[in-house]
Amino acid sequence: MDYKNKELCRLRTISFFLTLHKDKTQWEDALYSVKRDVDLLLPAVQKAGYTLQSIRVITNPFGEYLDLTNLQTAKADLQYLTELLNKFNESGIRIRFAIGAARNTEEIALLPELIAAYGDLCNACVNVPLDENGVLDNELIEQSVYAVQRIANITPRGEGNFNFTVNFNCKPFIPYFPAGYHLSHLPNSFVIGLETPDLLVEVLKSVPKSPHNQFYADCYQAMSQALQYHVDQVLEMLSAVKLSGKFEFAGIDSSAAPSKNCSSITKIYELMGLPYFGAAGSVEVSALLTKVFKSIQRVPLVGFSGLMLAVTEDLGLAEGTQKQYFDIRALLTYSAVCGIGLDTVPVAGNAKAESIAAIMRDTGTMAFRLNKPLTVRLFPIPNKVAGEISEFESDDLCNCRLLHIPD
């Protein structure tokens, strides 16, 4: 199939970054401004031959606009936002909502019950900084671990942790959930994220075998050229649309967002000569893929713009856990040269809080030391131990063998 075929590249998301204020009477107009631009963008996307999978709205920190007097007042505000989102959802495209970052331990403590109640309309993150000595804020980490464990225990099969992550060295304008957040001093903006595993797999099929260095150079060139073509097509589409002016275009996240419904990222490793993802050589391929995503020109690259290894969202990675092709240490190693950290990793329900906190600190230390955005999104599975298989029912998740966190 020709790499220019639009079926090989989908628009995973158009994500709108929006500031909300305490005055709830302004919320309807704010969300309507998103709808207005969606109504302008959707026909342009379709005319260009692409498929748009989701619209996402990402706000400033929820403590700046939700009434956090108590859990009930916060839920009431989220209920109102849910009603507004449902009111404006006329396109039939999936709408997802992120309430931004929790800024302190008190706000983190509210998240389990809010996520349990509102799920995919209540995605949230925590941004953990370094202190003056270059050490991660362990109080925020420990409260985040409590939230992860609480979410696991009060949502079916622990699936609520799909909507919560801990960020390290992550900047605004990540279009993906739940790591995306907005800051109120930044302009309202939108970002486009792509789903391209099918594209990358297809182009690699036609790269002829040659000696290692030449083969890897050819693989890089083929993937970079194909990805740049579709980015240029998206930019051409945007240039032809006259939007409302309420949102600035902030850029594209060039990551190959994974999905149950497209090629596995592991197929790329196999096409590049590895027996499986996790075998010796996986770091080298991961680094080359990251180079591909960073090669995109003529547009600001925002978000992760790197290799996403989301374990429970990728059928090949999920299968790899069951075959014991890799472990948590391997995922952390690959994060040194690529994207996202420990993302959607299922672990034992009885994993120690101290061990989860320690693996978060390891990931965060790597993020700041190597100056890259990394996240930790773990799924403790109640009543299961490492080595057992998850029993997820969510349409977004693949079942995996639970990985062990080294004590």
State where each predicted segment sits:
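Anaerobic metallocofactor- and corrinoid-dependent redox/one-carbon enzyme cores
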Residues: 1-407
